[in-house]
Amino acid sequence: MTANPLPTIEEARSFLRSGRGGNVKVAVLDSGIETSHPLLRGLDLADDLAIVDLNFQIAAIPGEGRDVYGHGTAIAGIIRELAPEAEIGSFRVLGEHLRSRTLIIREGVRLALERGYHILNCSFGCGREDQVLFYKDWIDEAYTLGRHIVASCNNEDFMKREWPGHFPSVITVNFTDCTQAEVFFCRLGQLVEFAARGQDIEVAWTQGGRKKVTGSSFAAPHLSALLARILSRSPSLTPLQAKSLLHTLACPWP
């Protein structure tokens, strides 16, 4: 079997300009998505699930268009703005204080992979060394299935190890003060290789509101959306091929 050829850099730039995310499914593993928000008008979630612990048993229940914090709504708004034709699914794995458990996150990932999501946006990180292998299990599973993981990093020190961001197959994103939503940066030689807009940006928040935020959590969905644009025009890209292409398309990270 002959491998599908990689798009040329000129083709990839064209995909970034013209792609709208059609036929690409993006899973937002976060605090839920407020589907009634005015900035998300018309959004029909492909899935809306909350992963919860019911009497020591992890289960998925209806998310009911609810965000328990605001974080997930912000992520969804960024993705929808940049890739308006992408299908978005909400997998609520973070609680009211943006905390979670490894098993809850793992179940959210399992459901997203099972339901055919191409990109998993993970705007969270766990710095506990004793949890690394649990994260590695699903990162490896996603990689072997050809799915793309986009993650945030530690906001105070992007070199500080957090997972899933500190796995080489993951597209990990720091934030910059760049004001252009479609511009992103790359610096090789470290596991946090990418950076995108994420400082003092206005995003959708709970109760139909807006909020000015800063952090890598809000930079990551920029890359998720731009990757969705590319995949909508070149759907056979593997995670490593896509990451290599993003390296080439990115501006130098100063």
Region roles according to the model:
Residues M1-A86:
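Active-site core segment of subtilase-fold serine proteases
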Residues E162-S232, S236:
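Extracellular S/T/G-rich loop segment that most often corresponds to the catalytic His/Ser-adjacent loop
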Residues I58-R128, R233, A250:
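Subtilisin-like peptidase catalytic core
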Residues T2-P5, E10-R13, L113, Y117-C122, ...:
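C-terminal subdomain of the subtilisin-like protease fold in secreted/lumenal serine endopeptidases
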Residues S14-G21, E81, R99-N121, Q131-R147, ...:
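Mature extracellular/periplasmic domains of secretome proteins
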Residues R92, N121-G125, V150-N154, F175, ...:
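A cross-family glycoside hydrolase active-site/sugar-binding cleft signature
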Residues I33-E34, E96, G125-E129, N155-F158, ...:
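Solvent-exposed loop/turn segments at secondary-structure junctions
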Residues E64-T73, E156, K211-L223:
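Gly/Ser-rich catalytic serine loop of serine hydrolases
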